[in-house]
Every structure is written in C-alpha cells, then in structure tokens.
Amino acid sequence: GGELDYVRSSIGIDRIYDLEKEVADKTINQLLNFNDDEWAEKGKKYIKQIQNINTNHKSFFTDKMPHNFMMCGLIHKMLPQAKIVFCYRDAMNNCFSLYKNTFGTSGHGYSYDQTKLSKHYNLHVKLMKHWKNVLGDKIFLLKNESLIDDQKGVTAKLLKHCGLEWEDQCLEFYKTQRDVRTISIRQVRNPINKKSLGLWKNYADSLSEMQKSLKEFS
C-alpha cells in the first residue's frame, strides 16, 4: 500500500480540495446521483488498480493517502467491507509536525501558514466527527499518544478491528526491509518513542496563532 490516489480516480473526480464553489457543487451533485450498482463498479475499479501493484498477492493492503479523510463516506459506499482507521494526534503535536516540514506541491500548501493550517485542521476535526457519527464502528479511532503509551494493547485492538490475527512482528515494524516512501521515513525505521511529544513547546512563542485556534478531536 502507501499514499495512493486510487479512491479519487476510481470515483472519477478531479480532486477534492481547493475547489471553486461552482465546481464543488457540480461534484457533489455528481456523487449524489450515483446508484448502488455504480458505486459497486467504482469499488471494483479501485480493487483492479490495487491488483496492478499488488505483485506479492497480499490479501490486505493499506491506503494512507492523507486526503482520504475527506472521502470516508464515499469509501464506505464503494468498498463497504473496507476497514477505516482514523489516526490522529494531539492538535499541537500534529500541526507543528506539518508546519515544520516541506511538502512541495503535494497539496499541503495550507501547512506553511498558521492561520490556514489551523482552519484546515479544525475543518478536518469537524468532518471526522461527522463521519464517526454516520459510520460508527466502521471507523476505528487510533490516537498516536495512546499508541505510544500502550503499543501492544492498542495494536491488539486495531488488529481485531481489521479482522487480523496477532503477530509479534507488529511490535517490530521498524525492522521491515520493504521500500517506504513517506516524509516520516526516519520514524518508520525506529521503534515507537516519545521524542516528538510536546516538541512544539520549544517554539511556543512563535506558534501563538495555532495555540489560540486549534481544536482537539474528541
């Protein structure tokens, strides 16, 4: 798996963020007009794209495209058996991590401005609360800080949600030899730790806008 753009392309929409109102309204109307058979076909199209890259013929894969959070309802419509996992962090820990990194032209331009970043994060929190209310147990909530405090316990609950058996290797993910393409590659290659918790406090005087505006997911 990885950060795949297959949800959007399978549904057939150009993009899901930074849309002009007219385009957004047209996209929403388009989505509302799909019937169950059409959603099922889009699900098959998604699986077909996955099969093209699943050279090891694995039974399970992950799609961690950041913007997928906007489409949880659509994902459920076209892939009703999909397991949705919402990974989130303390708001300041999360947004400081975004603010200090460079994403190039990957669709995260909001992350370079504290006001825009706070607005984006808060809208993301509001939307995820909506999806959780609508989809209920279809969405598994995984808070980073909880995973750090109890890696084994939280991992066991995650595996149960996904219908997977326990494997001790789950606690040693950093030993994997597979290719990893993510801005957090250094974290992936190391055990879970608390190094990034509260790191933003070292720069608190320069982060007043975020401290004032951010809302927690709860």
What feature does the model see in each segment?
Residues 79-80, 135:
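Short, structured coil segments at secondary-structure junctions
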Residues 70, 80-83, 159, 163:
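Hydrophobic/aromatic-lined pockets within catalytic cores
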Residues 2, 60-65, 83-88, 141-146, ...:
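Short beta-strand segments
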Residues 1-79, 87-88:
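Phosphate-binding active sites in nucleotide-utilizing proteins
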Residues 14-15, 23, 30-58, 98-141, ...:
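PAPS-dependent sulfotransferases, especially Golgi type II membrane carbohydrate sulfotransferases
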Residues 5-7, 89-94, 147-149:
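Conserved nucleotide-binding/hydrolysis micro-motifs of P-loop NTPases
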Residues 75-79, 85, 89-109:
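Conserved P-loop NTPase nucleotide-binding/switch module
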Residues 70-73, 96, 152:
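Short N-terminal helix/helix-N-cap motif within the alpha/beta-hydrolase-1
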